[in-house]
């Protein structure tokens, strides 16, 4: 009933923090488990796997958008994204006593990604389909997906379990089949997000969709943030920052205006940022001490534009469970 549904969802309404990230068999990462805190700084030597860690996070985000298989295809397919080392590393290989060499594969091809959060955890296992004459015979498919409650995956706290085309949802002490014909190329988030019968799926999907990746803010002459854009209320800045002016206006209306202005003044004393609306299109105007006219976003230096993008990202009104950026 509605009361039971509310009780089931209520503890998870805030934007939860990730507590653990796990990656196996992805590019230069053989098996990695990373504890997460509120702020995480990843450093390491060249070739240590920093970019692979970041890309794995982006692949996880694609599961909630229905594009994880397409994202893998853009990276060159499953064969190009799998662990590039041998299937197993012997103790002597690890100690450097013998060369690292491969051998005949003993286990099925498998790429595993997952995370645990303050409320739910999620894991996905991608592999190759059974041999066929299909033109898509080399497309990866989803072998298994699991959603659980708590910091660790156990049978007792598993809430949703997908194996191939079949997905089951916890129903008290029993299991209920929620779908028997799931597409192998699409995550369960796009196929059984039922707020009444599978609220965990819907809640986790919206959480992942709230993740933001601010690693490639463009600042060239044709950058989206430099151009006037159609504007609507924008509680969270987009990945590419095209809605910067709308996000800025939203913060000024419903956010912490004093903190926003203080961040501008901290880098540019006496400056202020305004939003100009013409024909439904929003653009930024940058007024600086000593200048007789405001500068448009198209005139700003690369560094100034990126700084304003970061201010908008960090002063967002809506809670974000993951905001990620490359240094």
What is each residue range found by the language model?
Residues 2-16:
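Short, Lys/Arg-enriched N-terminal segments with co-localized hydrophobic residues
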Residues 249, 265, 269-318, 322-327:
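Conserved ABC ATPase signature
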Residues 14-29:
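N-terminal pre-Walker A segment at the start of P-loop NTPase domains
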Residues 20-22, 33, 110-114, 121-125, ...:
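Beta-strand secondary-structure signal
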Residues 110-258, 262:
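Electropositive, glycine-dotted interaction segments
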Residues 38-79, 239, 307-313:
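Phosphate-binding glycine-rich loops of NTP-binding sites
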Residues 31-37, 315-318:
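Phosphate-binding P-loop
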Residues 55-131:
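Conserved P-loop NTP-binding catalytic core
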């Amino acid at each position: 009933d509605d009361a039971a549904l509310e009780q089931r969802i209520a503890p998870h309404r805030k934007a939860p923090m990730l507590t653990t990230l796990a990656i196996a068999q992805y590019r230069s990462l053989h098996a990695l488990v990373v504890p997460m805190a509120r702020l995480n700084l990843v450093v390491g030597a060249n070739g240590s796997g920093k970019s692979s860690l970041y890309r794995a996070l982006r692949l996880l985000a694609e599961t909630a958008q229905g594009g994880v298989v397409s994202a893998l295809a853009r990276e060159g397919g499953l064969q190009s994204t799998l662990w590039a080392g041998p299937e197993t590393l012997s103790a002597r290989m690890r100690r450097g006593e013998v060369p690292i060499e491969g051998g005949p594969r003993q286990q099925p091809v498998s790429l595993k990604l997952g995370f645990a959060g303050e409320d739910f955890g999620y894991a996905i296992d991608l592999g190759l389909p059974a041999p066929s004459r299909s033109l898509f015979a080399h497309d990866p498919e989803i072998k298994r997906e699991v959603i659980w409650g708590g910091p660790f995956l156990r049978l007792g706290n598993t809430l949703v379990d997908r194996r191939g085309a079949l997905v089951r949802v916890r129903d008290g002490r029993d299991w209920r089949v929620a779908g028997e014909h799931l597409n192998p190329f699409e995550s369960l988030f796009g196929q059984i997000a039922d707020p009444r019968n599978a609220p965990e799926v819907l809640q986790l999907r919206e959480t992942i969709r709230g993740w933001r990746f601010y690693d490639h803010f463009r600042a060239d002459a044709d950058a989206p943030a430099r151009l006037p854009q159609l504007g609507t209320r924008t509680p969270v800045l987009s990945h590419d920052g095209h809605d910067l002016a709308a996000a800025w206006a939203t913060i000024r209306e419903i956010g912490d205006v004093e903190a926003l202005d203080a961040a501008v003044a901290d880098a540019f004393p006496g400056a202020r940022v305004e939003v100009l609306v013409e024909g439904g299109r929003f653009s930024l105007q940058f007024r600086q001490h000593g200048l007789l006219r405001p500068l448009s976003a198209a005139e700003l230096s690369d560094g100034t534009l990126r700084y304003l993008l970061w201010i908008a990202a960090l002063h967002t009104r809506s809670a974000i469970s993951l905001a990620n950026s490359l240094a």
